[in-house]
Amino acid sequence: MKTTMAAAATCLVALLVVVLAEAAGVGCTTVAYNDRSLVIDGERRIIISGSIHYPRSTPEMWPDLIKKAKEGGLDAIETYVFWNGHEPHRRQYNFEGNYDIIRFFKEIQNAGLYAILRIGPYICGEWNYGGLPAWLRDIPQMQFRMHNAPFENEMENFTTLIINKMKDANMFAGQGGPIILAQIENEYGNVMGQLNNNQSASEYIHWCADMANKQNVGVPWIMCQQDSDVPHNVVNTCNGFYCHDWFPNRTGIPKIWTENWTGWFKAWDKPDFHRSAEDIAFAVAMFFQKRGSLQNYYMYHGGTNFGRTSGGPYITTSYDYDAPLDEYGNLRQPKYGHLKDLHSVIKSIEKILVHGEYVDANYSDNVTVTKYTLGSTSACFINNRNDNKDLNVTLDGNTHLLPAWSVSILPDCKTVAFNSAKIKAQTTIMVKKANMVEKEPESLKWSWMRENLTPFMTDEKGSYRKNELLEQIVTSTDQSDYLWYRTSLDHKGEASYTLFVNTTGHELYAFVNGMLVGKNHSPNGHFVFQLESAVKLHDGKNYISLLSATIGLKNYGPLFEKMPAGIVGGPVKLIDNNGTGIDLSNSSWSYKAGLAGEYRQIHLDKPGYRWDNNNGTVPINRPFTWYKTTFQAPAGQDTVVVDLLGLNKGVAWVNGNNLGRYWPSYTAAEMGGCHHCDYRGVFQAEGDGQKCLTGCGEPSQRYYHVPRSFLKNGEPNTLILFEEAGGDPSQVIFHSVVAGSVCVSAEVGDAITLSCGQHSKTISTIDVTSFGVARGQCGAYEGGCESKAAYKAFTEACLGKESCTVQIINALTGSGCLSGVLTVQASC
């Protein structure tokens, strides 16, 4: 079988670099591929990977996240590269803090894992503007992601910058580094047909591949979702909830799944999406059954959209994604443990999968059996794609019960080592506990400051003027959510009008002569809306100030350079009672991006700022107000979150670190999927078939992550809020996130392991030891047959310990209980 040695010459091409690397004790790794797998140092490999995005966590979190990924059975970490984070202004670069990409890749290397570098540099990723810097739109003749010299020049400059940084740090496999694959562009095949210029699109995607390959990185280049017009010098890959039936566009290249969506992102008006552990395991097992070679979880850890990084529009600050590691880095059980069990079984048959001969046999009733054979050894997959029918399947004389919508893996074709629908890992219910720091007051003490709107209530002192209504992204270069549009008109006498503003939003506040006369925001997905407000003009000069706000820029789709935001074109009119309008659209408009508090950097709480506490009386429900309080860091090392219930919309900072936008007043819509969850059947995040949703009718996001590295122990910490729309901070409280209840169900003959996780949490009580069918959910189980013998065994083995393991034997059933499945629930 032919092997493409795309990286085999790396050690020769980059001889000097490698010699230096070897002098430091680092070896050279070759990466090639054939139609069965990647070939690393001459060995065919199954690779199980997971996405962790470095800017969505903190450098202090990276080692623990990567360690947990490795312990979960991962071989590699995959990440995008975030262009607008690294180059926020043209030729001004940022590689500090959570943008220290080299430090992140070194942490991957230190853990002994591989890495997949997805440069893009368009990334989508629910990231602001899909990762593209807004300043690109300032460049004349710019067309994004087309065969267009202005865009290609900037893309090549940034791509080369990242590659050179990686080479300088010896991060590519041929230099002894962890990077085994690199990606150029991202999901371009999804938009090629919408660009109205097929020739330019084709020329662009081939230019991307050629430009990437000229970089001589020594590892294969991939392109995801590029199923047609695929350049010959890249490997095309699949993204989706299921990729078992997908195959690459040509022979000789491996089947790679770059994004297996473990859940879904969240918008401000949507509930939480949950993809079951059973369904993900089903999809992964099918993928490897059907010759899959590399599978990546998107996301393995989602993290947080700190600052203004969330895209959308209307993507929440949380990017939890229902991933195996939750937003804060805690294990999401049973998803983490169930997939870990799957990885172990897949790895146990790795050689058979990548070297063995295979036969697919289609049985009746949507059952498929695949048998891999290598010499005298065999491994089998049995796949039941029915979504409502369990089946008995006979294989080589042995009958196996196969639950609906599941795959069984038999490493010897005789004994089932794993079934995707049977979870043996524990379920952990995470709970939030109020800050229990000693001497912390019962409620936070607040001071406040008005946002200074006065400079913006006239049309003077703007950055510039135009006799037209300009587009917001270009005008502000996205340096702030906010852009002021200001004009004035002379009016004879007093009169009443309706102020009419047509905007592409996402949000608008209108002031006339210094008074707030109206506000509105667009519904998600419909970003053209109108504001109509009754106003009174006085005799003489009248001032109209319109504050337009964006809430994350669009991250997906074609023709980004043509996507508008703000009051571009309007119209803006004053309409009298007779319907006669004064069109202000072509008046002289003064423009200024940002708010006074942003320019003053109030969030840094510099000396000299005048905060008012008004003898303890704090104004509430007043727009454009800054609030400040101090608090002690919660004890221990558990996750810290701040509950912002009672507030409306704004931004939060802790010790000057931007936690992101908050909007707890925006409730999640009621959707049918909130009242139905069954792992069986196709999972989808859009359309009519949604299921397994939670949080309908509740705040879209109430809790906001405060990383431990943002906090100071033993001294006051500062929380500053900019409340844009008017809210009440009196309910704000800090919590620690800890394991509450842990539960496991297992059959007689299996072992049950309970764990309260990290940070020295111990098992405090055994609450349920029930044989039979226990009703309810973990944390609130009831029913079944309580076993005193099982209760005694778990009490003796587990109380006061961080974890424990008990073998389930018939003797534990006790009198009156039938042998079968034992459910155990414990409290931490």
Curated annotation (Swiss-Prot):
Compartment annotation: Secreted, Extracellular space, Apoplast
Pfam family, one: SUEL_Lectin
Keyword Signal: yes
The protein, known as: Beta-galactosidase 13
Domain SUEL-type lectin: 746-828
Organism: Oryza sativa subsp. japonica
GO BP field: galactose catabolic process; plant-type cell wall modification
InterPro entries from the UniProt entry: BetaGal_gal-bd, Galactose-bd-like_sf, GHD, Gly_Hdrlase_35_cat, Glyco_hydro_35_CS, Glycoside_Hdrlase_35, Glycoside_hydrolase_SF, Lectin_gal-bd_dom
Keyword hit for Ligase: no
